[in-house]
Amino acid sequence: MKDEKVAVVTGAARGIGQAICEQLLEDGFHVVGLDISPVEWSQSPNLSSYQVNLCEAAAVSEVVDSIVAKHQRIDVLVNNAGITRDALLPDMLEQDWDSVIDVNLKAVFLLTQRVAPVMLEQGAGSIVSISSIVGTDGNIGQSNYGASKGGVIAMSKGWAKEFVRKGAQIRVNCVAPGFIATDMTKSLPEKVIQMMESKTPLGRMGSAQDIANGVAFLASDKSAFITGQVLKIDGGLVL
């Protein structure tokens, strides 16, 4: 349907990205999931997907062109895809620095660079990028991850100012998750999980749905007067 709102979500194959897609589907969007892996968790007619390496500019341009050709619009962009390659600074390999910066920061730049003109032509849109409390407050052993997520916040604040210069109602915000239960955290020792839960005032790890709820709010008209902000969803871990 031409009037159906379209949301593009990266890192859509599993975890937080899948939860975001499911929530936006429930909210009535047609969701386009992007991932380097196949998106196979649903056969909904309101979900379409593309396998794409978002670190390659040509591939990003091609997939955005395909989305616009099919749907004629992009109302929401959720930059969610991300990786970690943790190590203390003396032990961090250059390739681990590069790969995290490429996926977590460069890919956000490349995709937003291609989607923003679509939203500018429409005169409206919402861009939500997943940052992290590591991007706002840092963490031992995550120099690369912290730099990438801090960079996402800085870019988003700049874009919040840039994209509205000619009157377009394009909002740009970030969500900064705290300690979230995902496939990535399942391998952590129980002692580590208990330590993080004890440091969190609400006394538990967050869920992928907690993040999806925040993204859905920022994607919706309920947040129509919110832009350039970082929504921390961390159970009070960082106060």
Model-derived segments and spans:
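Alpha-helical segment proximal to the catalytic Tyr-Lys
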Residues: P117, K157, K161-R165, A224
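Substrate-binding pocket helix/loop in short-chain dehydrogenase/reductase
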Residues: L88-L89, D96-I101, I127, T185, ...
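Active-site helix of classical SDR
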Residues: T112, S148, S156
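C-terminal substrate-recognition "lid" of short-chain dehydrogenase/reductases
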Residues: F109-T112, L120, R204-I233, V238
